[in-house]
């Protein structure tokens, strides 16, 4: 993934990757045309949905009018708040360990400082693979930040759950699912679904399926002990990549 990050570092949930378009300015029209052609051919469209984390530099430029961006109303002085979309750590983001172990980072910084654009966060957000300090390493998902679904991971007792009132992130992520379903998507492949609480999935799938009864929801879940819980939460299919 290197400096560019992985395709699972989402920069805008409401946009189409410009690299996939023939005409960048018409990328949404091209996407809608793709769905139409697929349906005419008798096939279905299953879209990737990455709910656990976003890019560190997430900023939606295509969100519908009136939609508040993720983190736009956050209080970064709060490590955890049910009103925040992200988790915040103490101190600035420190990627020194990544720079030292990733040659592409080192090459950029030493060769030409003008083209080297380091991630800057103050305070740093928690990293997508549940790292809650400000110094992710090269084996962490350092280019991503964890979304807050109402779980305080650093509570004195380990974890505490805060689902009432409904966390801000729940509403925003459900709206994203509804947006793409309204475009004609037939289902979603939910990346690392088990890193997101089943309480959210129950909330989101009930709303989604009440408006789009034929929608299919597929979850990436690795713990067999959790299969029943995720099926009860509204998933139609579960899978893992073990042995692939």
Show which residues each predicted segment covers:
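Substrate-binding/active-site clefts of carbohydrate-active enzymes
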Residues: 1-172, 176-179, 227
């Amino acid at each position: 993934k290197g400096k560019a990050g992985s395709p699972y570092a989402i920069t805008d949930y409401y946009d189409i990757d410009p690299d996939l378009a023939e005409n960048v300015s018409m990328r949404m029209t091209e996407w809608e045309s793709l769905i139409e052609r697929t349906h005419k051919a008798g096939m279905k469209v299953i879209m990737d949905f990455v709910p656990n984390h976003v890019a560190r530099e997430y900023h939606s430029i295509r969100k519908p009018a009136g939609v508040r961006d993720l983190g736009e109303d956050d209080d970064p002085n709060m490590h955890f708040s049910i009103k925040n979309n992200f988790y915040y750590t103490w101190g600035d983001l420190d990627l020194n360990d990544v720079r030292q172990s990733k040659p592409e980072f080192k090459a950029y910084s030493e060769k030409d400082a003008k083209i080297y654009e380091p991630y800057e966060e103050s305070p740093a957000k928690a990293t997508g693979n549940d790292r809650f300090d400000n110094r992710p390493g090269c084996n962490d998902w350092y280019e991503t930040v964890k979304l807050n679904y109402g779980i305080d991971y650093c509570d004195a007792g380990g974890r505490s759950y805060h689902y009432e009132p409904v966390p801000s992130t729940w509403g925003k992520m459900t709206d994203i699912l509804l947006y793409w379903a309204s475009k004609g998507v037939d289902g979603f492949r939910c990346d690392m679904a088990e890193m997101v609480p089943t309480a959210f999935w129950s909330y989101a799938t009930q709303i989604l399926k009440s408006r789009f009864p034929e929608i299919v929801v597929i979850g990436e879940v690795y713990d067999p002990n959790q299969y029943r819980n995720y099926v009860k939460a509204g998933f139609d299919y579960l899978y893992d990549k073990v042995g692939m």
